[in-house]
């Protein structure tokens, strides 16, 4: 027993590497890590893992090679460890996710730099699609918790969630991908509603499905579209990162150009050996960071400044500094410490090292970062004490303090090593939480949130909106400023405690009284509105609080302002958290119902309270705000009545439609249209007369009320979001009001209805296709719309749906005639007088067809086609020169006679081919490789093609390799499909396959200049 205890203690001692704070072999570790020769020797003996180029073993690992052997070989094979993980809580298994295996396969097939990459097997794609679910759930859970603060999920919550879950390198890569997608989306404002979100962002995954998934999983009651774009881009980028690492392991040069198919086993081997991927893709609720499947700890590759280069002999000062950094690198892999002083020293040195290596924030220009360099983050004493609570090791405490004897018996079970994250991951997660709060200080709350994420079985409530949660460091302030800040904090705490009698006390929050703002840019009234403290709100109103004061932009005076909360008012906070009584109290006191939107310019846009209530689906709040004069179209108009140029703005109709709140949308539609003059663009002025004539011709069937131009534009945007997110009922309801279709909206609605097998809706959509203007037709109709409609044609059994599809195909084909089949002008190499046709005189070969003899001449046949030449040669070799009769089967005598007539006449000019024999002659011409005769038969078939014979002719053309005739039949199907379906509905499947293969070749929009 003593030996086991000694071995365990020795392993813990080596793993913690307390850098001289009492561990017996710390000096040995220090000397080993600074010796290049020793490190190289240990590197050569260490096992090499495939894919290890994506993360590196630091020198600290080399100095403890024996301890790592213990971790690698003993712990994973220990049944107790397997049993330990089996008891850990697991991530939920959800049924629906916003991608399919086909989507993942398309991302994996995307070329990089024009290079053709190896393909992934179907099993590898299926496995990767399943593993991605775990990464998505982790990011979504963290975004859900971060969104509690303001009851809204924006791109900032998603980006912080990605940084919490992924390593620094992966998170930075995902952030860059999100910035790229958002930039492309913003630059495609001119496309408006003509293209889908994914196409505008340059993404393969569906942004609309991700948005719908975020709504269905209730990440927040409000989802910003930029949040969905960011999450989509991050997940797609993760697939590309995994692909790059797998291909790098497959290729000898690491370039990913190796041949062969990537198997599921190769995929899993790379993931298991990658410390940045393995933990994220595990099924357990707690996040395993900095370890691979073997339990090997590692730091991020870019954290270490060493690339294997040698140091100069005369650079002693630099060598000493690098030695200190290498020792720090070892220490950051510690999973437990022996004293609070040791922990404080490690954290302090690590933060000092990280400040010099802080990467440029994605989306921030280098010039701006140079003008406003990031402030260093400090750790509060309570944060260090809380972190020490989770990293404390009783055995090491005894070694740190010789006067402290280890306990004879322990009351608590120690966490096994496999469940302990390294110190580096504790710091990474805690710093990310602090940065999300825009705080310069890591507090104990950040450590508790990190413990919940990193350790199994722990939980704590999300951060709440409180004044004390964003204190800046008082160390940077002089005595006077620090005293004022302490008094301000005391005033906020007094007002936040809920006692209304403290408002009149001398300790006011600041020089502005009850309108003083804290680091987050919030006033006491905003905090009271967020918490729903009606009594405190009333007292602050009576004390003269400004109801319409706005949250300022980020500044040194207010360093912790959340970017999305700028220009919010007290009414905004009350609406965000759904406190109806507080909203009514503020409105009764004179708060502006539109918040800050009326007095804000384009550069200070903020969502109105009605928009926030519409997104949340709060029917009572929407009704209250509408009754007080809130304008649902305010985001579509500026103060001068001009349409907003901020294309990312969503009006109230769009917010309710995007989140699927049908009852709220109906309530918004009951609001009477305000009599505001429409300001038209030049394009709208030129098109106004045409639109009015179209409207008058349609009559009143479009809807009961004539919509104004502004409301029509707003409702059309709402249709776009409802179609993108799969809310077909809302889309159809808006269409019933007379909102005109956009082609993309129609295609998305048709796709959703078809996938849900709602054929009644499909029928209505197909019937409404004729209302789409032809100038709306674009490439999407060819690549997506026709493909979808042909899929419906193949699977639908509804006669009405088939007839409507036929009408659409005929309409798309247009009135132009089917392109004719060109003749082949070919002169036969040899000719004989027609007198010798089937003439026994001078004949040197005889054919036996249907028991009848047919006399011919070799000189003509051998030069006519290779088929005849082969036939003659094989016959001579088999039977010798004595037998001159060649039997021809499967061809009728008169068909063979017409075939020979073509050869002896030298063409088709003098031939008369009966209509009933054309197909048989075509088959014979194809058999004997007479191309000109076959083409002539194809032309004759096209001239006699009818509704009754079209399907059979098409099948005959496919069997006998007549491509021009098959192409002509496909055009005939498109042009006469309605009549074809009426004549023979059983042939619809064949026609669907035929027309689908060449539909876009014939479609009118493709032939347009």
From Swiss-Prot:
ANK repeat spans: 520-549, 566-595, 605-634, 648-677
Tissue specificity field: Highly expressed in liver, brain and testis with lower expression in the spleen.
Keyword Secreted: no
InterPro entries in the cross-refs: ABTB2_BTB_POZ, Ankyrin-BTB/POZ_domain, Ankyrin_rpt, Ankyrin_rpt-contain_sf, BTB/POZ_dom, Histone-fold, SKP1/BTB/POZ_sf
Repeat as UniProt keyword: yes
GO molecular function: protein heterodimerization activity
Segments forming domain BTB: 843-912
GO biological process: cellular response to toxic substance
Protein name: Ankyrin repeat and BTB/POZ domain-containing protein 2
Record CDD domains: BTB_POZ_ABTB2_BPOZ2 (cd18350), HFD_ABTB2-like (cd22913)
Keywords: ANK repeat, Repeat
Cross-referenced PANTHER family: ANKYRIN REPEAT AND BTB/POZ DOMAIN-CONTAINING (PTHR46071), ANKYRIN REPEAT AND BTB_POZ DOMAIN-CONTAINING PROTEIN 2 (PTHR46071:SF3)
Function: May be involved in the initiation of hepatocyte growth.
